[in-house]
Curated annotation (Swiss-Prot):
Homodimer. Its cofactor is Zn(2+). The active site is at D68. It comes from the Archaea. Its EC number is 3.1.26.11. The gene is rnz. This is Ribonuclease Z. Zn(2+) 2 binds at D68, H69, D209, H267.
Length: 307
């Protein structure tokens, strides 16, 4: 059975909060597993306004340690503790995560009532998180920063005719799918016995802050969704590139070359009030470009292509 995958844009601004936008924070919910990518100031309040609960967060992935991407963590963790959370929270980040986050989370007087684990991730690695994989890449930014690719496992499509020929009931088919094989009435059935092709898993790429990079084209290749740093429109490219960011036009070029399904503009400069200029710039390069907005949600549809 294919997973339900939903993206929730909690906050879409950058640098500092404005009346229009909250700080960076993106939820990716895969069935009942809620992942948070970046946690800027005020993220917990944005989550309260959304269809999700901050108590349900399983994993937090920080792209880098500029304040607008992680200063919301302390309040979020304390609120979880005040609300009697018991399940483990995993926080992932680039080099320096353990020292920086341990210091930040030890500020003030409060008691942590649940297990919290901090992990430092290496670039150019793939990590198995059970229902999905996380792939990392080093960004072009003034401090250590990672892009994340959230990858659903490939799904074997069951050929109902093959299953019918072998008299395998549907409840046993699911056990075969889950385990790769299953013994039923004394016979072992393998997934290959009833397979009708493989449906490629869906992929979401979240860049965090970065200058435009050729490596991003390959990293995001054929992703269903690319959420890319688009701090300004093309008229400010030299300035934003100098500070380690991208324009909407540059992000759209990457999206087009990577052949992604859709691009979401993200991490708008607080000086920008009208993002339609960024969208117009981007769509000259890549038509399937969309503005992200605070509290907007998008369901990532199951791929129809089967190998």
């Amino acid at each position: 059975m294919a997973s339900n995958i939903r993206i929730i844009f909690y906050g879409t601004g950058g640098s500092w909060p404005t009346p229009l936008r909250a700080m960076p924070g993106v939820g990716v919910k895969i069935d009942d597993v809620l992942n948070l990518f970046d946690c800027g100031e005020g993220t917990q309040k944005q989550i309260m306004k959304s269809s999700t609960s901050f108590m349900d967060i399983d994993n937090i992935f920080i792209t880098h340690f500029h304040g607008d991407h992680f200063l919301g963590l302390l309040g979020l963790v304390q609120s979880m503790s005040f609300n009697n959370r018991t399940k483990q929270l995993n926080i992932f980040g680039p080099h320096g995560a353990i020292k920086i986050l341990s210091n930040a989370l030890n500020v003030g007087y409060y008691t942590l009532h649940f297990p919290l684990k901090i992990y430092e991730l290496e670039p150019d690695r793939t990590y198995d998180l059970g229902k999905f994989l996380i792939r990392t890449m080093l960004n072009d930014h003034p401090v250590p920063a990672l892009s994340y690719s959230i990858e659903e496992r490939d799904l074997v499509r069951i050929d109902p005719e093959k299953a019918r020929e072998k008299n395998i009931p549907s409840r046993i088919i699911e056990k075969i799918r889950e385990n790769g094989s299953y013994v039923y009435k004394g016979n072992e059935y393998r997934i290959d016995d009833i397979a009708g092709g493989v449906r490629k898993g869906r992929r979401i790429v979240y860049t965090g802050d970065t200058r435009p990079m050729d490596r991003m084209i390959e990293f995001a290749r054929n992703a269903d969704v690319l959420i890319h740093d688009t701090t300004t429109d093309s008229s400010f490219e030299p300035m934003v590139n100098e500070f380690g960011h991208s324009s909407s036009r540059q992000a759209a070029r990457i999206a087009r070359q990577a052949r992604v399904g859709r691009l979401y503009l993200y991490h708008y400069s607080p000086r920008i009030t009208d993002t339609s200029v960024l969208l117009e710039d981007a769509r000259k390069e890549f038509q399937e470009t969309y503005e992200s907005k605070d509290l907007m949600e998008y369901e990532v549809k199951v791929r129809r292509d089967v190998d």
